[in-house]
Regions:
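Short, small-residue-biased leader/transition segments that mark boundaries at the very start
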Residues: 1-7
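P-loop NTP-binding core
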Residues: 8-272
Length: 272
């Protein structure tokens, strides 16, 4: 893990601490990435932090997961990245208390091509988030399930990366490529970037496989691993279809409790 794990954001010259920018990333789909982005954001907001969630996935799952009609919004991250909309007209305020959202929809899939000819295209999102770090304690980036220019933008803007890993047989598939990409971005584009940690998702205590995956990852992955493990939970799976994070949809469910514990761990890492 090395000395980079000790890097801290410095207060800007006015003395106010800048918000942390956490990219939730894994190019493997179906690992609970959007679920983690939604519910970590909501549980940090529940604890009184001012949070901005940015949906960087053209599928728009984080957008709809907060009850926003992704097909009925005029301004999204796509328009913001291309300079076709103002930030104030793009941010959806208070999707839940203390939590704002920059939404996305399928239009964002065209950004990859349209950004190609732009100078310093890797830094476009950073230019946006750097202006927002004084307003929010946390900015959570839900990355697309691929290592494309949108993900590179997220890693260039982020202060740290959180990687959800599903407790399934192919859990480590592609992870070495993601970590290599993170290392390259840190070396060439974003010196402050660090590994926030790995969080296990969709854990099923009834199966030996889940336990084996956890043990295998711990043995083979030289990264911070969160103590909190997110269980496979029916209520957690239902919540997005109702447009609510789990702590609102079913506050007493195992899914809600686990994401509250994850939020506590994230907060504790800020204090250490």
């Amino acid at each position: 893990m090395g000395s980079e794990m000790c890097i801290r954001d410095r207060p800007h010259k006015g003395g106010m601490k800048l918000g942390r920018i956490i990219a939730v990333a894994n190019q493997k789909g179906g690992v609970g990435k959007s679920t983690t982005a939604i519910n970590l954001s909501a549980c940090l907001a529940e604890k009184g932090k001012k949070v901005l969630a940015i949906d960087m996935d053209p599928q728009g799952n984080t957008t709809s997961g907060f009850g926003v009609d992704k097909n009925g919004i005029e301004n999204t991250l796509y328009e913001l990245l291309l300079g076709e909309a103002e930030m104030k007209d793009t941010i959806v305020k208070d999707v839940v208390e203390n939590l704002d959202l920059i939404p996305s929809n399928i239009n964002l899939s065209g950004a990859e091509i349209e950004l190609v000819g732009i100078d310093d295209k890797e830094f476009i999102l950073k230019g946006i988030t750097d202006k927002l770090r004084r307003k929010y304690d946390y900015i959570i980036l839900d990355c697309p399930p691929s290592l494309n220019m949108l993900t590179i933008n997220a890693l260039t803007a982020a202060t740290s990366v959180l990687v959800p890993i599903q407790c399934e047989y192919y859990a480590l598939e592609g992870l070495s490529q993601l970590i290599h990409t993170i290392d390259l971005v840190k070396e060439r584009l974003n010196k402050r970037l660090k590994m926030e940690g790995v969080v296990f998702t969709m854990y099923d205590a009834r199966t030996n496989l889940s336990l084996q995956v956890v043990e295998n990852v711990k043995e083979n992955l030289n990264q911070n691993i969160y103590k909190t493990i997110i269980p496979r939970n029916v209520r957690l799976a239902e919540a997005p279809s109702y447009g609510q994070p789990i702590n609102i949809y079913d506050p007493r469910s195992a899914g809600a409790e686990s994401y509250r514990l994850l939020a506590e761990e994230v907060l504790n890492r800020e204090d250490n």
